[in-house]
Structure formats: C-alpha cells, structure tokens
Amino acid sequence: MSTENTLSVADLARENVRNLVPYQSARRLGGNGDVWLNANEFPTAVEFQLTQQTLNRYPECQPKAVIENYAQYAGVKPEQVLVSRGADEGIELVIRAFCEPGKDAILYCPPTYGMYSVSAETIGVERRTVPALENWQLDLQGISDNLDGTKVVFVCSPNNPTGQLINPQDLRTLLELTRGKAIVVADEAYIEFCPQATLTGWLVEYPHLVILRTLSKAFALAGLRCGFTLANEEVINLLLKVIAPYPLSTPVADIAAQALCPQGINAMRDRVAQTVQERQYLVNALKQTACVEHVFDSETNYILARFTASSSVFKSLWDQGIILRDQNKQPSLSGCLRITVGTRQENQRVIDALRAEPV
C-alpha cells in the first residue's frame, strides 16, 4: 500500500494548523459553575424582540441601520465603520488584508488578549512579542527595534487582562513610529467603561489607525457575536474585500440596531454605572481579604488580583461553582486571577469564598 493511502486526515492539514494551540476561551475551558466570572460578560440578560422576520432572504453584507447607528454612537462617518462577527473577526480581517504569510509579522505586547497571536498563527503570519514594561505600559524602544517587517501592531486599551489604560502619549508616539510602516490596531473592547480614553478622534490624524469595538461587554450582548472596526475609508474598503459576503445574520443585525438606538445606548450607560459601582465594592472587599496579595487598578468590568496561593484558590472556588479566569501562564502574571464584576450577590459569594480560604 502506498504511503499516500495511509496518510491521516490530520497529515493533510497545514503544518501550522496541526501545531496550533487554539485560544482557550471561557466556554472551551468548561466548568460546571453557577457563578460565571471568567469571560467579562454582563451578568444578566437584556431582552429584545425580533422585528425582522424575512429569513428566506440573505442579509445585507453591512446592514445599513447597524452601520449608521454605530457611526452616530461612535462619532464617526458610516464609511469609517465595518461590522463583523465579533471584534475577533476584525482582528483576522486586518491580518488577512495587510500581512503576507511567510513575509510579514504582527507585533503585540504581552500580557494581553490571546487572539492576536492565534489569528496570526492560523493564517501563517509571524508573531513578534515585545513584553510590556513592569507597569504594563508599552516598551516603545522594544517596539521600535522590531518594526522592520512588522505590518500590524496590536495594542489593547484598556488592556485585557490587566485592566489599565495605555498611556495616551505612548500611543501617540507609537502612531508616529509606525506612520508609513505599519497598521496600529487599538482594541477598545472595554472602552465603554472609560469612554474619555477612546482614540476615535485620532482617525483623521492617523490614517493607519484601526479601532476595534464590540457589543459583547457593556452592551451585554456577548451571545450576539457582533463587533465593529473603525478606520479611515481606505482601510474599510480593503477589509470589505476579504470579509465574508454575509457576516451578520438578519436576527443579529436586527438586535444590534435596536441596541444602538438612543434608548439602547442609555440603557448601556446605566449598566456601565452599575458595573463601576459594583467594581468598587469588589475592589474594597478584595483589599480586606487575607489570601489576596494585591488588587490592581481597573478601568474595565473585571479586576486582576494576585493571590498568595492562586492555584488552590482557583480550584477551591471552581469546586464551589465559582468560575474565575486563571492568568498564571501569562507573562508577569504569576499568582494572578481575573474576576469579572458580577451582580452584588455573585460578588458577595466570591468574597465569602475567598475569606474562607486558608492563609
């Protein structure tokens, strides 16, 4: 029998896909909890009624109501907005549009969101890392030293999982360093919790700036899978060349348009205020908990904390049905767990469980 007939299906796959370690999403990690504080979701559901029932027809590639509503909300032109299946698809689209596999590289600054790396590896694009400084700000010299051959630089602000904003002057320096050389992607998935820090006002000045947004966090629609890419029209037109022909289903577009109407935006801002209040409650309580070494400042809907024995704490709470996010494997985050801000009842369960931990 020939070797060709004995190859497994896996042998037929691309080598980089065979070697790929997929992104460990909260759902992929599993668990049997009833307090889910590991995915930075809003803790309660928002109800919507479908108004579009014409499901026998394909949807628009870029639903007009969604684009126009988001443009008005974000303070940009409709031509500067692209909607996709979550911001994760936006990450992939930028890499596919701007990076030649085997030639170009992306650059990111760990500890940060894992999908930048996974998306590049899936496509076969080199990944370069310039670890953040001790205060988790950008190592601008390190980035500058690695720009040759880099086509896309990813920066998350506020950063996931650390929760802090990137210094705006450093972002401006980065944009000057990369002008004419690379695209800079600012991931603003959590910007609703600190809207004053958005870079949307910089799009005119920096044609190579791309901003990622989502409805998964403050809009409480993680299950909808709806994200946005904001950029200059030239960039948006390039991304439209590589996006799928029907990225958003009719029900998704229907609900997204409703969420982005004035009433929906006001409701989102109420949720943000509620989350910020609960975040402060949780921070204060964690600082008075014996097994907690340090609580890091956060501008988001989650808190990063360092524990005296994070692995045993994580497992203990897991066994009690309280699911947190272990960050031990991230660079510089040894001993750290990330806790999504939940309801007052959920937050109290976390505190009660932590205070029962042996020290």
From Swiss-Prot:
Disulfide bonds: none annotated. Pfam families: Aminotran_1_2 (PF00155). The modification N6-(pyridoxal phosphate)lysine is found at K217. Gene3D superfamilies: Aspartate Aminotransferase, domain 1 (3.90.1150.10), Type I PLP-dependent aspartate aminotransferase-like (Major domain) (3.40.640.10). The keyword Transferase applies. It catalyses: L-histidinol phosphate + 2-oxoglutarate = 3-(imidazol-4-yl)-2-oxopropyl phosphate + L-glutamate. Its cofactor is pyridoxal 5'-phosphate. Its EC number is 2.6.1.9. Keywords: Amino-acid biosynthesis, Aminotransferase, Histidine biosynthesis, Pyridoxal phosphate, Transferase. InterPro entries: Aminotrans_II_pyridoxalP_BS, Aminotransferase_I/II_large, HisP_aminotrans, PyrdxlP-dep_Trfase, PyrdxlP-dep_Trfase_major, PyrdxlP-dep_Trfase_small. The keyword Amino-acid biosynthesis applies. GO terms for biological process: L-histidine biosynthetic process. GO terms for molecular function: histidinol-phosphate transaminase activity; pyridoxal phosphate binding. It comes from the Bacteria. Pathway: Amino-acid biosynthesis; L-histidine biosynthesis; L-histidine from 5-phospho-alpha-D-ribose 1-diphosphate: step 7/9. NCBIfam families: hisC. Homodimer. PANTHER family: HISTIDINOL-PHOSPHATE AMINOTRANSFERASE, HISTIDINOL-PHOSPHATE AMINOTRANSFERASE-RELATED. Belongs to the class-II pyridoxal-phosphate-dependent aminotransferase family. Histidinol-phosphate aminotransferase subfamily. This is Histidinol-phosphate aminotransferase. The lineage of its organism: Bacteria, Pseudomonadati, Pseudomonadota, Gammaproteobacteria, Enterobacterales. The gene is hisC.
